[in-house]
Amino acid sequence: DEIGISVGDEYEGKKVSKNGCPSEGTVDIFIEPHTPPPQLVIYGKAPVAEALKKLAPQFGWEVKFANEDVEPSISSKLVVMVVATQGNNDLKSLSAAIKLKPTFVSFVGSKRKFTSLKAKLANSGFAETDIGKVKAPAGLDIGAVTPEEISLSILAELLQVRKNFRNGAYDESS
C-alpha cells in the first residue's frame, strides 16, 4: 500500500497477494566482504623456500615467486616477502624486496650474514629505516633445523604478522 498497490491488484503482470510469512515481507541480507588473500612473495629456490611454498597455501596465503629481475604483481593489502636465496643473489633479492615496500620482509640466514648485507644495502643507498624493517633471521626461534621446520617457524611468524595486521595492531618494529 506504500506505493498505491493493494492486495488483489495486478502489478507488472503479477497478482499482488498478502505475504503469509511471519517476517511480514522483510528480508535479512548477510553481506560478507571478500578480500584478496594475503600474499607471500618468496625470493629464492632454497629448500626452505620450497618447503614454505608447500605449507603456506594451507594457511590461506597466495604464494608467488620472484627474483631480483622479476617484480611480482601485488594485489593484496598484506604482502610479506621472504628472501630464501641461500647465498644466490642475496643482496640483489633483498634490494628488490625492500624497494617494493611490503608489509614485512624477512631474510633466511644467520645474523652474521645479514649484518654484512646490511652494510652493503646501506652503501647502495638504502635508508637505515628501510633496512631496519628486515627481520633476520626469519621465523620464530623454535630451534628449527630442517627446511620443513624452518619453514614452519617462518609461517608461524607470518601468521602473527597477519593477525596483528588485521587487528590494526601491526607494528613494523616488533
Please state what every model-predicted region is:
Residues W61, P102, F126:
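Short phosphate-binding/catalytic loops that engage adenosine nucleotides
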Residues V108-R112, S116-S174:
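Adenosine-phosphate binding glycine-rich loop
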Residues K45-A46, Q86, G143:
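Glycine-rich Rossmann-fold phosphate-binding loop(s) that bind the pyrophosphate
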Residues I74-F107, R112-S116:
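Rossmann-like adenosine-cofactor binding region
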Residues D1-V80, K113, A119-A122, E157-S174:
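Segments forming oxygen-rich coordination pockets for charged ligands
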